[in-house]
């Protein structure tokens, strides 16, 4: 069957830059799914996205569906003919519906009986017949939260659509989508080139647009922006300050990226660089430049959509745009410094944290008390932690943060230093929100860690305490992020903290505000659940996690040590047999209602068989090793020691009848198994590793 490459392009008005990439990806995903559902064969589907277009390109698309033979089963032969062998009404009706005579029907014989059968030849539809429905299906499934109407059309899309190009090879496929009839017209650059032009072949889409000053390939355009930024910064011996999010947003704003450099008055550098950077990156999509020491330069880069004949005018225009924004930041900074953070505490009384949980001032007081407690647990300065916790939210009332919300915490640090607060206190105001995202830095001191943990725990306990648990994708108080933050701080900084203790203290600090009696258990379980998800993301096997989770250790560092130990144990040659033995032991003890406890009494005088005597000796030796290793959380040592018991355990089960007739002997042997089980449970429930 003939194949050609196919292009579908929607020519639009400027698309929302933050949604452009996801729209392009979704268009390709949905169109590919539609092609597959229609049984149209193809090699691959790729996508293009630029500010004024969305397109999909299908390589090796078949010109139509393959013909099919569809088997249509009729009534059973016993019901298809009467006693004289004449077709019944059921058989005649079925045959008529399929356009055949009963005599022409074939027979389908199975072990359940015999039926009439018609094999219908169904010719496949051509790609020209199918494309309209497939395109409309894909477009209707794009992630568009707020579609809009335009002109006199009843159709809706994220932005008005003005051109529709659908080519199968060099042929136009006539379809109607979003009120437009397809053709071969494509929009070039708004200012360069010919404007609209006709595309001769699907294969020439990207190259023809490039001649018209449009880079339609999103990733290629992003790479070009990146390279120009790096080259321009290198020429200035500076480093561009951007991340992938900013880069993608810039690439979504331009069709033909051209990087230029501009500058601002050096006097603005007296303002904290974070505020200036926020203004440049978030408000204007400019790229700040840093020197080798990380200091901000008064030169910056910006990306335009044109190759200007007079670049100086474009540069001057952008400098005029940024100047008043920087002047605002300078004014806010200087005016804010006239008021101390401590004097802003009372104004926090006017801001609600949550209706049932009180104001931000009350939250600050709780954070202060909890920070001091945590500091006492990790040998940090309690006085500084309490002070930092009290001032943690005061910068929210400053003019700078009200204007530029993303600099909260950062400005708290600068204002605290201006007020003469201790350096660790100031740093804690900045680091209280860490980690803000996956891979973000962690608090750098015990004081900062105490405040960061206190803030997150106060939110977790408070929201759970009034019964507003996160459901599905809804997590308005970012409790999942808070839980992950707690876990990262405690584990990566190796802090000796117990979730039960932390949550209990946070509940106490709330006084009588909380109404959920299950808060303690629910918060600890929620955080541990996030821990399990994090560990799965790190490629830890689910059964390893479940084995540790069964013991419910609530010290995150202890939990992690157990997981790593079980993960190593699972790779040992003895692991499978020992897991199976643990499962067998657990089942025996459960059936006999024997509870595994820390203290197990075994009567040596009742040990009659050599195999049970040998097991007892080995278990007592292993018990001593376990007792030595537990305080240092050396679970790898524990499991390595217990792994040496494999042969003696196998020998016991091969030669000893646990359920002896003598009740005393039976209970003694059950006690022996209880000790074995207890030693393994010191680390995890190894029986969970046993294969079903």
UniProtKB/Swiss-Prot annotation:
Tetramer of two alpha and two beta subunits. InterPro entries: DALR_anticod-bd (IPR008909), Gly-tRNA-synth_bsu (IPR015944), Gly-tRNA-synth_heterodimer (IPR006194), tRNAsynth_Ia_anticodon-bd (IPR009080). The lineage of its organism: Bacteria, Pseudomonadati, Pseudomonadota, Gammaproteobacteria, Alteromonadales. It catalyses: tRNA(Gly) + glycine + ATP = glycyl-tRNA(Gly) + AMP + diphosphate. Belongs to the class-II aminoacyl-tRNA synthetase family. It is an enzyme of class 6 (ligase). It is found in: Cytoplasm. NCBIfam families: glyS. The keyword Translocase does not apply. Keywords: Aminoacyl-tRNA synthetase, ATP-binding, Cytoplasm, Ligase, Nucleotide-binding, Protein biosynthesis. SMART domains: DALR_1. GO terms for cellular component: cytosol. Gene3D superfamilies: Isoleucyl-tRNA Synthetase, Domain 1 (1.10.730.10). One of its GO terms (biological process) is arginyl-tRNA aminoacylation. GO terms for molecular function: arginine-tRNA ligase activity; ATP binding; glycine-tRNA ligase activity. It comes from Alteromonas mediterranea (strain DSM 17117 / CIP 110805 / LMG 28347 / Deep ecotype). This is Glycine--tRNA ligase beta subunit. Its EC number is 6.1.1.14.
